[in-house]
Amino acid sequence: MADVPGYLRTCLDMGKIAFLAILVSTGIVLQILACALFNNWWPMLSVIMYVLLPMPLLFFGGSDSTSLFNESDNSWINAAKFLTGASAVGSVAIPSILKHAGLIGWGALALDLSSYVVFLVAILGYICIGDASDNYYSYI
């Protein structure tokens, strides 16, 4: 992209951020629909896990975002990876347990899990944008 004019490059970069914002808002809408369509607010429990998911990396990972993907001897980084993985499993386990207990139906389970998948795609998209060669998004 070195030969692309600056104004076009900025427009494309803002398009990527807008796409990520649309993904996140779609995930929020799916989460609310999982609750509102079936008049059952139990699926909102998985929102707690969505909020807790990035916390270990924020507290223990520091400013190095690549520490999640690299092998490390630092015990704090390893603890952050473990707690993040446990939160990710909990994000899928909570709706599954609620369905098994009979508190939510199949539709709410499908919407809740699809919300999780949309959030996951948004996070992976953010990581891919953050790994760009120009490090333009390092301030976000």
From Swiss-Prot:
Subcellular location field: Endosome membrane
Keywords: Endosome, Membrane, Protein transport, Transmembrane, Transmembrane helix, Transport
Any single GO BP term: protein transport
Pfam families: Vps55
Residue intervals annotated with topology Cytoplasmic: 1-16, 62-75, 130-140
Transmembrane segments: 17-37, 41-61, 76-98, 109-129
Keyword Metal-binding carried by entry: no
Keyword Transport: yes
Recorded topology in the membrane: Multi-pass membrane protein
Membership in a protein family: Belongs to the OB-RGRP/VPS55 family.
PANTHER family cross-referenced by the UniProt entry: LEPTIN RECEPTOR-RELATED, VACUOLAR PROTEIN SORTING-ASSOCIATED PROTEIN 55 HOMOLOG
Function: Involved in endosomal protein transport.
Protein name: Vacuolar protein sorting-associated protein 55 homolog
Species per Swiss-Prot/TrEMBL record: Arabidopsis thaliana
